[in-house]
């Protein structure tokens, strides 16, 4: 495999010295870029884009051509696993993902199997291999999955939800059914992420987008324990390097200590927590990723730079162990030049923190 020309992202995740704070953006390959919209139109639809290795690689690399980002992230979707389980995923205009055959009972859970990463999900592994080849060692490639809880919300609700009534009804009235589903999903995520690592992903991330809708007790039982199982099951060394794992629970700031105790290398932060507080609480155990509000990218350049400076100052001296990112995905109508201001500001303004 090609030697990495820029390994700052991996080094920061392992709390090793870097000369500036590395940065990437969640959803950095996406609709805010006109070139992405053109490639998606060429593919026909979103899943066709995901399933074409050359086009998936093209959109993964597009933001790196515009901005000096320190990592690439696989272009894919968190719903690939439930799709491969046969739930009939489609993306409906104006309403997001919809599953034609949602999980409603124990029989539905019993029916689904653990997808073969080099079978039903081989298109994802082909994309990882293609991206690694096309990156030519410029920056590391991040693989990812949704968390078992977050995947289960879509599978039980039948799509996106605001109130999560169906899955919470299952959680409170038939917890053994939900645990059986979550256990299958955890095994599927372990298999899927390990296959991504073998195919060339140099770090992995688990997105627990909906963990923050749970009570503290339910978060431990229905989300965190399954992410802990995933961390325990992952390949942690490959190609002679540590493969860092980042866990990100949106609205999970109250549970940082418990997340850090899973054995992950880094914890993702959304914008609702002060990074100085997060560092004081868990910075001795894990690296931190985050955590600018994506909406700041609508602001004029001086305001973007001011926010970057504030977050860097919050993390403070001894600045290794911080990967700068947004607190969630970049919004689709952000001007690309504002994303450029953000990335350049992180590099420029972080250098004094890395003497």
UniProtKB/Swiss-Prot annotation:
Residues spanning the signal sequence: none
Pathways per UniProt: Porphyrin-containing compound metabolism; protoporphyrin-IX biosynthesis; coproporphyrinogen-III from 5-aminolevulinate: step 4/4
Subcellular location per the Swiss-Prot or TrEMBL entry: Cytoplasm
Site (Transition state stabilizer): 77
Example GO molecular function: uroporphyrinogen decarboxylase activity
Assembly and oligomerization: Homodimer.
Function: Catalyzes the decarboxylation of four acetate groups of uroporphyrinogen-III to yield coproporphyrinogen-III.
UniProt protein name: Uroporphyrinogen decarboxylase
Organism: Vibrio cholerae serotype O1 (strain ATCC 39315 / El Tor Inaba N16961)
